[in-house]
Amino acid sequence: LKAKERGAKIVVIDPRKSETAVRADKWVSIIPGTDTALGLGMIRWIAANGKLDKPFLKQHTGAVYLVDKDGKLMREDAKDPNSYLVFDEKSQKLVRHDAKNIDPALEVKAGSPYRTVLSMVLEQAEPWTPEAVADTTGVPAATVVELAKDYSTNKPSMIVNNMGSFQRTQYGTQAVGAQYYLALLTGNIGKAGTGICDAGGVTQMAKFGSAFPPPPNKPKKVAPIPTAKLGEYVLAGKPNKINFWYTQTCGI
């Protein structure tokens, strides 16, 4: 609420009229599980009304990367995973994304054997007119437009989704993905006051000690286990055989 005192507009999108919603500038009630539709509808309006941050998309995102008909990212060298290809507006040729003095296209001509990542995102958003969003989410079409306009024009803008929120529900990953696309498409990321914040606003917290007492013969140094290699380490008993696993306050 300190941000509100400094002039920020706070909008809460929540089926419930929570404590935060009561204090916000606007509360938008939404049908549970329909957040992805709202995000895609906002993306559609932003693109259709010239609110894309094109310089940001070209310089700082993979929106310009080319995708072939099989849905695979195109690369100059199959052995180099970072050699993504883009279509250069200046030379009218396919070049590496990190080549100098190029102007990568955000979209290419219809009928081309490839398309950009941005085109694929906008294709997903195309069916979601304000009216279609309203039918699915229960959010009035005028409110959908208002949200998209405010988010894309009143910069900096930030999305706070409170520790994953609907990410723990069915198709929640798509909802979070739509939020990140909103931030990237409008340049609302990587700058002060922007981004996607997954921190919570919890104030009622109880303090507990360790769930288990420390082992009496705990070694001084225990090698960490890389999250990405967790399965491999467990199956191989590496660095030690694992008979019991306890996870607290995080996912695996």
Model feature map: region roles:
Residues 128-134, 160-168, 242-248:
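Glycine- and acidic
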Residues 4-9, 16-154:
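Long, well-ordered, tryptophan-enriched scaffold segments
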Residues 1-11, 37-38, 100, 104, ...:
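Extended redox/cofactor-interaction regions of prokaryotic respiratory oxidoreductases
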Residues 25, 157, 243:
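Conserved acidic residues
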Residues 51-56, 144-145, 158-160, 187-198:
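Acidic/polar loop patches that form or flank catalytic/metal-binding clefts of enzymes
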Residues 17-18, 33-35, 44, 71, ...:
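Short, glycine-/Ser/Thr-/acidic-enriched flexible segments
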Residues 26-30, 43-46, 173-179, 211-214:
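Short secondary-structure boundary/capping segments
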Residues 144-145, 151-177:
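P-loop NTPase catalytic cores that bind/hydrolyze ATP
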